Amino acid sequence: MGAMQPMHWLIVAVVVVILFGSKKLPDAARGLGRSLRIFKSEVKEMQNDDAAPASAPVAQPAPAQLPTANTAVVANGAAAPVAQPTEVKPL
């Protein structure tokens, strides 16, 4: 009773064709296939990435020193001092 019988699948297919139209279905199937291919390739890359660090550990570079609150980074990448805020008295 809970399983889908061939008649149920036929009704579902007819409803899908009526809702989406015969012109949009090939485009939707093509997009779904492309998405699945991308997903499979990403899963393979993740598996390859997991296997690579176990065999050859890569040295991590030392983190760069971040500018402090009293300095700002200018266009050439050098840190320049920033003026300190002054107190303004109301009139």
From Swiss-Prot:
Membrane topology: Single-pass membrane protein
Any one cellular-component term (Gene Ontology): TAT protein transport complex
One GO term (biological process): protein transport by the Tat complex
GO molecular function: protein transmembrane transporter activity
Keyword Glycoprotein: no
InterPro entries: TatA/B/E, TatA/E
Transmembrane segments: 1-21
A Pfam family hit: TatA_B_E
Key word Membrane present: yes
Subcellular location: Cell membrane
Record keywords, A-Z: Cell membrane, Membrane, Protein transport, Translocation, Transmembrane, Transmembrane helix, Transport
Superkingdom field: Bacteria
Subunit structure: The Tat system comprises two distinct complexes: a TatABC complex, containing multiple copies of TatA, TatB and TatC subunits, and a separate TatA complex, containing only TatA subunits. Substrates initially bind to the TatABC complex, which probably triggers association of the separate TatA complex to form the active translocon.
Function summary: Part of the twin-arginine translocation (Tat) system that transports large folded proteins containing a characteristic twin-arginine motif in their signal peptide across membranes. TatA could form the protein-conducting channel of the Tat system.
NCBIfam families given in the database record: PRK00575.1, tatAE
Protein family (similarity comment): Belongs to the TatA/E family.
Descriptive protein name: Sec-independent protein translocase protein TatA
Gene that encodes the chain: tatA
